[in-house]
Amino acid sequence: MSGFSKFLDSIFAFFRSLYARPAPQPPVPPARDDINPPAVRVTQRVLLVAYNPLINPGTGQKLFDIMGWRTPESLCEGFMADIMETSAGLASFQVVEQAEINDILPFKDGFRYEPAALMDVLQRRAAPYRAEQVDYAELLARLDALRRVSAGDFDEVWVFGYPHAGFYESIMGGAGAFFCNSNPLTGTETCPRRLIVMGFSVERGVGEMLESFGHRCESIVRQVYAGQPAEANYFARFTRYDKVAPGMAEVGNVHFAPNSEKDYDWGNPRFVPSRCDDWFNFPNLGSSARQVNCDEWGKGEIRQHHIWWLRHFPHAAGQINGVANNWWRYLMDPNQVGKRL
């Protein structure tokens, strides 16, 4: 072939390349879910509310000072340290704002204590008013909580009240709210995020705060495993105790240790076989049972039992059937429940 012919062929090849269809490319596979999500740390931001009524306007005396109770700040310090420790550092609460309510909130039915009547109840000179609950709508409106949670100012609300104030240990509101040791708050669906209102008491201790949090945990993990087949419901297995599953105890629940025979029976010295240690290896279950009794969890002390119980909650990487092996992901942030990993 002459040089001129080669030149013409190169020219034709150039023009053909301008109008030719591009060579087909191999299809790009769809992005797949991370089948081994890491056990990431979760931090919940808290609005801390002291429900501390003004009892004597003349002297400025408020309820907490008159009664000599603990401060919310001192209780929070111990509670938050326990959560950090039991979660192996994967869960933490951060108080981002504090507020104080100095008048007396109404109950849901409209009843409201006068300061003198409230003191009579708290000092046991009169019987308490038996109402279903405090007016949560009034509380949330005062705090502008629905809008502010929607805006991301904070994630949940902790209210430190007093005996007979009408607060549940925990209650959930917002779009998609579900049972959280009490029925969901109605009229809160305008908030696109689930929010939890914890009800604590300055009359009590850190152990009782862990009790309230423990019931929150029970409700949330039950919701996580709702709809799972029985053999895949790991929380049902986690909560077994000897009284209802003889010889098959695992960790138990908030009220029942592995060997408990009644509610709050955390000081029972009876030995029973338990696979509680198995949960430190989750999801690789299969360890042998061993004999345990109350020596393991504080011999009846409420705080020590609840710390022991919470330490057993899984916090591993990965997932099974779409449920994260790190349960703290859900215990802290209810918006993770039902969310695709």
Predicted feature locations:
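Short hydrophobic helices that act as membrane-entry/anchoring signals
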Residues: S2-A20
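Intrinsically disordered, low-complexity proline-rich regions
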Residues: A23-P29
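Propeptide-to-catalytic entry region of secreted or membrane-anchored zinc metalloproteases
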Residues: A31-R147, Y168
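Acidic/His-rich structured neighborhood in mature extracellular/periplasmic domains
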Residues: A126-G207
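Active-site recognition of the HExxH zinc-binding catalytic motif
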Residues: E203-Q223
